[in-house]
């Protein structure tokens, strides 16, 4: 795997200018997954001092030391935003299809869905928000955009007595990432049974190791005393297996590309598992969630990598609570990522013309 930067620990979704600066410091670059390189250890959070004084609403402090990100509404669903985002996705799907690329959406559910019993007193999803994930899936289905019910996938993991999110982190566990990679592989192969490339070019999976530390929500948003109260937790990550014949695979094009935020970064294992299951290289570009899904797609489509090689399948990872936020969602995305919907469409069309 020819990773241009080591795998990093992410910054959380940025709702404030300080978090935007932190996110830029921790941002990942375009990575090629499925060809070689070892998984690097996580980077220590670089914005701790800046963010400790942030509004406590950014993080919800639940029971038994559980922390929840606070950047999605627990009471209201932006139906108009869901409709508009789906319209933009449909435009992207059509333009990509005209260039021989199939667009699929990986919609990740909110952490709160799986640990409602750990939420603070008086904090809970309203009945309307409980139906939000299904509403987005139905909108994608009505638009003819392939996706799958990852909430159901992760509930199966949870029902097997495994955690799907870390207690003090916004991110998922390896068990959750692996299960989602399996469902994603099925989605890819259902639509494209014959992927280009050579059998045996997928990533070999290494052994798992554990490390004890604070989750990102604790590291970035709690004071030193508050962190001591919630405590560290054990992370399970998979080491990169030693590749065989590495030099032969370095330039092998990937038939599948994933674009998204820090949930799909290599540290948590999703792209490696997907590559292993598909038995093909998988390429990836990701940045922390404050950059937003709209800027991430453009980053890839406007890149030399896309111009040099168009994948057969583009998996666009999105997050349920932020699906309704469009390209111009001020206060949600990094200022550098903001643009009117019309500008986003213009850049999309320019990247995919010819």
Where is each model-derived feature located?
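Extracellular glycan-modifying ectodomains
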Residues: 2-6, 14-29, 35, 39-354
């Amino acid at each position: 795997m020819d990773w241009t930067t080591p795998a990093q620990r992410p910054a959380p979704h940025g709702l404030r200018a300080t978090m935007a600066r932190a996110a830029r410091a921790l941002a990942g670059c375009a990575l090629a997954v499925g060809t070689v390189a070892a998984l690097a250890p996580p980077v220590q959070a670089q914005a701790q001092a800046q963010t400790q004084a942030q509004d406590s609403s950014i993080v919800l402090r639940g029971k038994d030391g559980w922390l929840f990100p606070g950047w999605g509404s627990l009471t209201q669903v932006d139906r108009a935003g869901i409709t508009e985002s789906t319209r933009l996705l449909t435009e992207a799907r059509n333009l990509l299809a005209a260039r021989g690329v199939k667009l699929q959406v990986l919609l990740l559910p909110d952490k709160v869905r799986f640990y409602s019993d750990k939420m603070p007193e008086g904090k809970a999803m309203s009945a309307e928000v409980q139906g939000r994930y299904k509403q987005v899936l139905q909108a994608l289905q009505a638009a003819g955009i392939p996706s799958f019910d990852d909430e159901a996938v992760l509930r199966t993991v949870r029902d097997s007595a495994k955690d799907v999110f870390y207690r003090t982190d916004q991110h998922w566990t390896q068990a959750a990432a692996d299960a989602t990679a399996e469902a994603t592989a099925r989605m890819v192969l259902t639509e494209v049974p014959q992927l280009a490339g050579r059998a045996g070019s997928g990533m070999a999976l290494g052994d798992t190791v554990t490390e004890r530390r604070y989750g990102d929500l604790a590291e970035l948003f709690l004071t030193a005393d508050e962190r001591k109260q919630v405590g560290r937790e054990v992370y399970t990550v998979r080491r990169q297996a030693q590749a065989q014949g590495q030099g032969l695979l370095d330039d092998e094009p990937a038939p599948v590309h994933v674009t998204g935020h820090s949930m799909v970064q290599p540290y948590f294992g999703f792209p490696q598992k997907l590559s292993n299951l598909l038995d093909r290289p998988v390429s990836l570009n990701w940045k922390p969630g404050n950059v937003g899904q709209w800027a991430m797609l453009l980053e890839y489509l406007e890149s030399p990598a896309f111009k040099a090689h168009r994948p057969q399948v583009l998996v666009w990872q999105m997050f349920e609570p932020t699906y309704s936020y469009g390209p111009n969602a001020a206060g949600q995305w990094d200022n550098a990522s903001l643009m009117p919907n019309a500008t986003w469409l213009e850049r999309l069309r320019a990247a995919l013309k010819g």
